[in-house]
């Protein structure tokens, strides 16, 4: 983490359990991010927290540190059974659940607390085998958690810590009934530590906090600057006919180390993938149609740097901790203005700088006023020279369902292109 992203507050300044301090120091975490510095004094005092912070500011480590400390500092109930986890962390997507689990593993290795993972799509028996051996902290998506609970593979009667991550996304995806179903099977709110984190805290999320938490304290980091100080935003107005060529020209001009291209539909994403793969880029595709194992593999390849570009719908826009994304391209302006914030929040993370480039085409330019009103500023407009756009581009590849994650390796030096004005 960059020093500019950290506070003077050190984890060792808090009365954290020694094993938690050891795990953090082993990972090189010494100073807190702003959200951690605000949340930890409250959770260590046993207070519930509803936290709002920009994506990439350390929300995950804030609730993981709090959860591990609480479980190490408070004994489990005397008659706790093997199918009763002590902490439940709920996430809106499988990818986010997997990421939280990965972030929690170093803490688990040092503290000895056992982790479980529960998400739909695949791995039912493998996940169940881990649960049957007993876990302290269960991380998962609501559908699979309810499935296991209804079959009595898990029992929530011994829960001491609850975390809701990306709570507003839970609403967007229609999971609120599932969340309430799970809460009804836990001890009362005043008998557990409750944490809720999200990049936005809407009225409906605050209502959920009021329902399911015990007088939660609200903490916010830079709420007035929704898009982040370190993200350079840029907007182009292409015609529909020039839109794809402009994207390809910008990618050649910027030559990003690691970029995400967002579009509003899976079919548009597949089309973009085909053009970029045919042009020699190492590009992956992430949509709801991609099988779960392939989605995780593609994310892993992108994180490792084996892929340079990820083309995605908003399934990948929330909560995923993909390091060192240098550029975000909004091929389509999103219909939901909150998604604009979450999309461009993929870059400029943990104190790094980032670049967001949006294309306001004839189809989606109508979304721009609402986006700019929501973020509180106008996005700077850049012009381009249509005559400088790339030409003679190869015919786009058609997606083959057996290999949606791989394009050719991009080779050669970037082709220099210049914008006008």
UniProtKB/Swiss-Prot annotation:
GO terms for molecular function: ATP binding; ATP hydrolysis activity; RNA binding; RNA helicase activity. A motif (DEAD box) lies at residues 165-168. The keyword Transmembrane does not apply. It catalyses: ATP + H2O = ADP + phosphate + H(+). Transmembrane segments: none annotated. Its main location: cytoplasm. ATP binds at residues 53-60. GO terms for biological process: RNA catabolic process. It is an enzyme of class 3 (hydrolase). Residues 245-390 form the Helicase C-terminal domain. Residues 403-414 have a biased composition (Low complexity). GO terms for cellular component: cytosol. Its EC number is 3.6.4.13. Keywords: ATP-binding, Cytoplasm, Helicase, Hydrolase, Nucleotide-binding, RNA-binding. Residues 40-219 form the Helicase ATP-binding domain. InterPro entries: DEAD/DEAH_box_helicase_dom, DEAD_box_RNA_helicase, Helicase_ATP-bd, Helicase_C-like, P-loop_NTPase, RNA-helicase_DEAD-box_CS, RNA_helicase_ATP-dep_RhlB, RNA_helicase_DEAD_Q_motif. Residues 393-421 are annotated as: Disordered. A motif (Q motif) lies at residues 9-37. It is found in: Cytoplasm. Belongs to the DEAD box helicase family. RhlB subfamily. DEAD-box RNA helicase involved in RNA degradation. Has RNA-dependent ATPase activity and unwinds double-stranded RNA. Component of the RNA degradosome, which is a multiprotein complex involved in RNA processing and mRNA degradation. NCBIfam families: PRK04837.1. This is ATP-dependent RNA helicase RhlB. The gene is rhlB.
């Amino acid at each position: 983490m960059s020093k500019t992203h950290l506070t003077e507050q050190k984890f060792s300044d808090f009365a954290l359990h020694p094993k938690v301090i050891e795990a953090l120091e082993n990972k090189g975490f010494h100073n807190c991010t702003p959200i951690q510095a605000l949340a930890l004094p409250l959770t260590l005092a046993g207070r519930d927290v509803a936290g709002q912070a920009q994506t990439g500011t350390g929300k995950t480590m804030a609730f993981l540190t709090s959860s591990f400390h609480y479980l190490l500092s408070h004994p489990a109930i005397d008659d706790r059974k093997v199918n009763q986890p002590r902490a439940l962390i709920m996430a809106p997507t499988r990818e986010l659940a997997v990421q939280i689990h990965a972030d929690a593993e170093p803490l688990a290795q040092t503290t000895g607390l056992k982790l479980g993972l529960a998400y739909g799509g695949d791995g039912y028996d493998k996940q169940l085998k881990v649960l049957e051996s007993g876990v302290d902290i269960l991380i998962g998506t609501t559908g699979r958690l309810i499935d296991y609970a209804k079959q009595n593979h898990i029992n929530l009667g011994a829960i001491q810590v609850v975390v809701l991550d990306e709570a507003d996304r839970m609403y967007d995806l229609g999971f609120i009934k599932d969340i309430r179903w799970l809460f009804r099977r836990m001890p009362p709110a005043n008998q557990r530590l409750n944490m809720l984190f999200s990049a936005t805290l809407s009225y409906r999320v605050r209502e959920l906090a009021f329902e399911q938490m015990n007088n939660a304290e609200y903490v916010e980091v830079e709420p007035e600057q929704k898009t982040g100080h370190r993200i350079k935003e840029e907007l182009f107005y292409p015609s529909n006919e020039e839109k794809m060529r402009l994207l390809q020209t910008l990618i050649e001009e910027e030559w990003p180390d690691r970029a995400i291209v967002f579009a509003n539909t899976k079919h548009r994403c597949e089309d973009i993938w085909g053009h970029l793969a045919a042009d020699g880029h190492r590009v992956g595709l992430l949509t709801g149609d991609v099988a779960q194992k392939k989605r995780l593999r593609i994310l892993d390849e992108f994180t490792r740097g084996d892929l340079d570009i990820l083309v995605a719908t908003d399934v990948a826009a929330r909560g995923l901790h993909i390091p060192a994304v240098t550029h975000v391209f909004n091929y389509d302006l999103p219909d939901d203005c909150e998604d604009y914030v979450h999309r461009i929040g993929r870059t400029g993370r943990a104190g790094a700088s980032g670049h967001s480039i949006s294309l306001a085409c004839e189809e989606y330019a109508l979304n721009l006023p609402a986006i700019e009103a929501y973020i509180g500023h106008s996005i700077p407009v850049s012009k381009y020279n249509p005559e400088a756009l790339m030409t003679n581009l190869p015919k786009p590849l058609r997606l083959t369902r057996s290999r949606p994650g791989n394009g050719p390796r991009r080779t050669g030096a970037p082709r220099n292109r210049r914008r006008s004005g």
